[in-house]
């Protein structure tokens, strides 16, 4: 079965979120790869998952979920959620909420995915924060500084993020191009270039 998930970067303003279809049987280790590519993060970064308070399966005092777990082990019904922490040292907290469970035919009608594609992003909002930001609060400070031409580092900051950076821009085509390089095989998710 496919899971329609809402992936939300917590505490971000402007909002940064993605909605995607992903197999419920996917191990959390592979979910990290999908989520990182969906958001625009690095797949090699550290991460962990833990149950959210709204989950119908919430083991007490479990700091993180076992790596061999799948989405289906923890997200049983729409409304269940997990916390996904990307780069724990920087604190990029995401809430992963199960919105729907459907068969591949139900999920992707009228636009079925080509054979072998593992995940597909339907929509979202907001650009991925630049890699040099140390958490959402640093990103929000960067946005404030980019908005103020009187900042002494204004030009340097724009050079660092790139003059084409737009925090409100979401490139759905680029996200899906990254996602569609992923394939599921007997060893888990592979990245085909």
Please give the residue ranges for each predicted region.
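Short linear regulatory motifs enriched in tryptophan with gly/pro/ser
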Residues: 1-193
């Amino acid at each position: 079965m496919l899971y329609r998930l809402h992936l939300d970067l917590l505490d971000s303003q402007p909002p940064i979120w993605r909605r995607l279809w992903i197999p419920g049987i996917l191990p959390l280790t592979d979910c990290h790869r999908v989520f990182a590519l969906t958001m625009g993060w690095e797949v090699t970064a550290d991460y962990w998952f833990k149950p959210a308070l709204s989950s119908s399966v919430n083991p007490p005092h479990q700091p993180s979920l076992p790596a061999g777990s799948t989405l289906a082990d923890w997200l049983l019904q729409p409304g269940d959620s997990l916390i996904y922490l990307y780069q724990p040292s920087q604190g990029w907290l995401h809430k992963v909420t199960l919105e729907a469970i459907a068969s591949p035919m139900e999920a992707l009608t009228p636009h079925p995915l080509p054979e072998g594609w593992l995940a597909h992003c339907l929509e979202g909002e907001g650009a991925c924060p630049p890699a040099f930001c140390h958490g959402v609060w640093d990103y929000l400070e960067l946005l404030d500084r980019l908005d103020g031409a009187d900042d002494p580092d204004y030009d340097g900051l724009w050079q660092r993020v790139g003059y084409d950076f737009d925090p409100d821009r979401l490139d759905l085509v680029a996200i899906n191009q990254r996602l569609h390089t992923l394939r599921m095989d007997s060893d888990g998710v592979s990245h085909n270039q």
